Amino acid sequence: MKFSHKKVYYLEIKCYLCPKIIEIYQLFMKKKLTLAILAFLSSSMMTAQVEDKKTEGEGDKDESAFTFTESQLGEDDDMSQNVTIVNSNSNIYANEVGYLWSPVRFRYRAFNQKYNDVYINGALMNDAESGQFRYSQVGGLNNQTRSGEYSLPFEANNFAMPSMGGTNNYNFRPSAMPIGNKAALSVANRNYTLRGMYSYSSGLNEKGWAVAAALTYRWADRGYVEGTFYNSLSYFLGIEKQTGNHSISFVTWGNPTERASQGASTDEMYWIANNRYYNPYWGYQNGKKRNSRVINDFAPTALLTWDWKINDDMKLTTSLTGKYSMYKSTKLNYNNSDNPHPDYWKVLPSSYYNVWNEDDNSYRTESAWDAWNNAYNWLSSSKANRQIDFDRLYAANVGASQQGADAMYYIQAKHNNQLDIKLSSTLDMKLDDKQKLVMGMNLGTTKGMHYQTMDDMLGATQFHNINYYALGKYDINSEQVQYDLNNPNAKVGEGDRFGYDYNILVDRADFWTTYSATLSRMHAFVSGRVSGTQMQRDGKMRNGLAKDNSYGKSGTARFLDGGGKIGLSFNLGKGNIIQLGAGYELRTPTASTAFASPEINNDFVANLKNEKVFSAEFGYSLSKSWMRANVNAYYSRIKDATEWQCFYFDDANSFSYVSLTGVEKEYYGVEYGLKFKITSAFSIQAIGTVSEAKYANDANVRYMLSTSGDYGDDICHLKGVREASTPLLAQSLTLSYNNKGWFIDLTGNYYDRMYLSPSVYHRYDQICEHDNDGNAIVPDQWEGNGGFMLDASIGKLIRLKKGQLSINLTLTNILNNRDICTGGYEQSRSDLTASGNSRGYLFSMNPKKFYAYGTNGMLNFTYRF
């Protein structure tokens, strides 16, 4: 199970699939093929030219739809970003769910986003540490992300072994962009309120040159949620030269963005504020609104692609990618003072009076009721009382500074920067009219830089790099309270690093191949891959809780993984097709889950091993001139998965680093899509899924508190707990009209079975109560409200003497249903005090939630010329 980059591995693949492959082997010494193989081996990856299969009308219609999807992805650091995007030209269901169900953050089959691979020009763009692709990286690049090739879990493609959650390959070559100029202006009441776009593509001229450029600006002084703002500039620039059978393209793009976040809160606080979109992250400073959670995100990327058409049956594509991403997220914190957050549990009415238990004699008294009313009256009397009081924080810090004390309140910034370089190559060979062989390689090296800085001292004059959380256990003069023993008691100013500073280093090599063939009425493919990964931590501070195991490089974890897939489709005639697929693979644990407490020490998670993933699928599709239909049933099971999380454990005034190992999960369900024409202008479409996604066992858990540095082990009772923040049941019915340049859609959506992220703490065996037989009594998982949502869009395409103008209006949640819960999490704090007494406030009854936006829309004007 080890892989070393210091050794060279040769992989010999003997293939007896068909006589044509033997002929290719015999031709190996011929010049062109020899050059192709040498270039393939030396470059290392694969990709394929792709086509934009959307028609002009569909492009006009999708403009607002795509923008809506984009606005829902990764727009809040505290909401789940596990959003998967799938598409398919052959599957009605997969073709629609990407944007249609984005208001509730739908994830394809409830999979984690790391199972959804995204490529650009054949180069893998998923983050090497988390395994996920962040769609904000291509935010605003609407034209560029239109052109692409998509494959479902058991559909062969030209750029990779298909992933369990679908695989996308966007074509960013300038010659693939729609020729001409395009200008667009949009107004909305979503995360941003104004958007301007301009794009240009020359197409290939007589000398073989193509140039493409795009610029997008998105802005909101206030987004849909109060206290948020949005400021983003997207750019794209590409040039391509084709000469003979060769094409070289260079493109660069980026999306520098600054945006303010929305925080989850409890239903009690939403009720007091009379607002489902109450946001605890902002407050007033000198009478002006200020958000404490501001995200700055910029990932400039450059991509060099060489395409070589060796002959009519063979093509080589090679890409070199470089990306430097800069991600900063701020947060209000406090030191030796009261919690400044406006929805802190101690200021809520239910902390004084137990609203859940009528038999509670301690917290159901007359004085407790008076305290409840006083708290309610205070919070409900003024909006300012429900928000952060920055003026008070400044005053407290000024007073502390006058006494020579450290800042009591401050804004810290967490940085997650990354340098990523990838080299990839693909060789696409048509063996004959019925057989095809594609093979590819990917090499990548990543340096993730993780550290914390002082963003704003809020009027204070000093702060020290000391672990104030540990002061309750250790003396101020002890080594354990030092974040960096190499620089003890270091003074921290604005912009200085403190708390933690470390790098994560990841190297990966991947080899894959896909063979596909058509035999009479059967089409089949076989795909396989083998990969090697190594990872390590490089600490830049010597933490007092792990003075001999935090500074410098850790050991190196090495993994060898791989797997295979097979897919079959049978054409039964008259438009009837049956599909079958099965796959098994080993997957290396991601670097983001591999380290037990990366902010403190170099330790890897105990018992770290490859995931084992099995998946299977059965599908049926029917295609007629007036109707298309498909239904798919699937089953997937994951074993030996590793999960990691970090949360603030209020009971111990400490951060808790939690690793779950030996995790098993299973996913199964049925998906369907149906679309048929009523007349030439009217059509009806129905799509839906009924699914299950849950833990299949109780996991091993190891945890550490940031105040002690000691590990604890337990069993976490997760069996039966569902995947969170996505509907496991969703249905849609759409009535469409498309005639003489007009298009109108009316869609009814129903969502249900949306669960909140579980608290692992409340499911530790030592925390759970037990019955007389010793079995743990595990709390039920919180489920959010589902509901019905009505959407509509109307548009008109107007052809002008010079170009064409399209106008479209998209409306979401027309009936203003604000009760649909899109996600949230259970709080990880006990209902008992440290001494074992009951609290009036029950954390187990007060999860924090997000709700779907009420009525919102976008009006879009697009001019092409």
Q: Whereabouts are the PLM-identified features?
A:
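Acidic/polar loop-and-plug regions of large Gram-negative outer-membrane beta-barrel proteins
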Residues: 240-242, 247-305, 328-413, 476-493, ...
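A beta-strand signature from Gram-negative outer-membrane beta-barrel systems
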Residues: 127-128, 139-184, 195
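Surface-exposed extracellular loop regions of Gram-negative outer-membrane beta-barrel proteins
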Residues: 258-260, 264-265, 269, 480-491, ...
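Outer-membrane beta-barrel signature, preferentially recognizing the C-terminal barrel domain
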Residues: 279-301, 305, 504, 554-563, ...
